[in-house]
């Protein structure tokens, strides 16, 4: 997996918001909890504060981006394993 930092994540934001599915978003939040990128409160806030799928996607990618390059790299890897089409649209590639 290439190094995929905050700058690259910001470039892929529109594709993420437009193409991500609710199930994928929930799985990604679970993965970020498991990787300790988020705590339970942060994860709950993303889901409970947003009713629309696109708003959940925005909150999720913005929260990860604020956490920095390491968090973005973990997130990119999780996206690549969950949804190849989404990863490709965001410019995430497997090496």
UniProtKB/Swiss-Prot annotation:
InterPro entries in UniProt: CARD, DEATH-like_dom_sf
Gene3D superfamilies found in the cross-reference section: Death Domain, Fas
Domain CARD: 1-94
One GO-annotated biological process of the protein: regulation of apoptotic process
Protein name: Caspase recruitment domain-containing protein 064R
Lineage, broadest ranks: Viruses, Varidnaviria, Bamfordvirae, Nucleocytoviricota, Megaviricetes
